[in-house]
Amino acid sequence: MSNSEKNFLIGIVGPCGSGKSTLIASLEKHGYRCRHIAQEHSYVKYMWQRITNPDVLIFLECSYENSTSRRKLNWLPAEHEEQQRRLSHAREHAHLIINTNLLNPDEVLAHALTFLKENYQ
């Protein structure tokens, strides 16, 4: 895929610690345009559509245990559940959902690249 074919916008959404920043940096190295969507901090369920309106939405799943260990967060399970609630609308509209719990960053990137090449070439 040439860079001109990668002009669509990819939105990356997920709970804190799911790997959004890492995936964005990796996809950008491959020539993709990406945006971090901080939907986990918004009470407006469709805010991700209004502000970013991505052509492709990738949702990164991450458990409470992994979120808190990856980011050294001092959270209670209820805070993670609240993020999941705030993210539910974006998750329902995601083109790709990647469970990052058992994957390293290279494996997450491989899933995303395979999906993009198969569906957006």
Regions picked out by a protein language model, each given a short descriptive name:
Residues 73-111:
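Small-molecule kinase domains that catalyze NTP-dependent phosphoryl transfer to phosphate-bearing small molecules
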